[in-house]
UniProtKB/Swiss-Prot annotation:
Signal peptide: none annotated. Gene3D superfamilies: 3.30.2320.80. It comes from Methanocaldococcus jannaschii (strain ATCC 43067 / DSM 2661 / JAL-1 / JCM 10045 / NBRC 100440) (Methanococcus jannaschii). It comes from the Archaea. Ni(2+) binds at H2. One of its GO terms (molecular function) is zinc ion binding. HAMAP family: HypA_HybF. Involved in the maturation of [NiFe] hydrogenases. Required for nickel insertion into the metal center of the hydrogenase. Zn(2+) binds at C78, C81, C97, C100. Pfam families: HypA. Belongs to the HypA/HybF family. This is Hydrogenase maturation factor HypA. Keywords: Metal-binding, Nickel, Zinc.
């Protein structure tokens, strides 16, 4: 389940950012929302990611944070027919040109996993 690895990376990145904010004198009480950009070619199961994050964030300022996911579509250039645009995706092993069905593609994008931003509550 690679979702657990992604959840761990998310939590670590957010807690590191919070630590930097606290070093500047800002005290963060709670993270309420986390917005992600996730490439479709990562094949991340969002429900499993949310569950894994919920479990590992327990007892931290991230406990109970709402996770929103924006999916990023991959782009391709077909090396056979020259098509440029979105590929057809059946699963992680079958990605092909929608025009000529070739698997000879140059892919770009679709593998991102970014924390776009997080909403926090500060202590008074």
């Amino acid at each position: 389940m690679h979702e657990l690895s992604y959840a761990n990376a998310m939590l670590e990145a957010i807690l590191n950012s919070i630590k930097k904010e606290e070093e500047k004198g800002k005290k963060i009480k709670k993270v309420t929302e986390i917005n992600l950009e996730v490439g479709e070619l990562t094949f991340i199961n969002v429900e499993q990611l949310k569950f894994a994050f919920e479990v590992i964030a327990e007892g931290t300022v991230c406990e109970g944070a709402k996770i929103n996911v924006e999916f990023i579509k991959p782009k391709c250039k077909c090396l056979d027919c020259g098509y440029e645009g979105e590929p057809e995706i059946l699963d992680e092993f079958e990605v092909y040109c929608p025009k000529c069905k070739s698997i000879r593609l140059k892919l770009s994008g679709g593998k991102e996993f970014n924390i776009k931003n997080a909403t926090v509550e500060y202590e008074d």
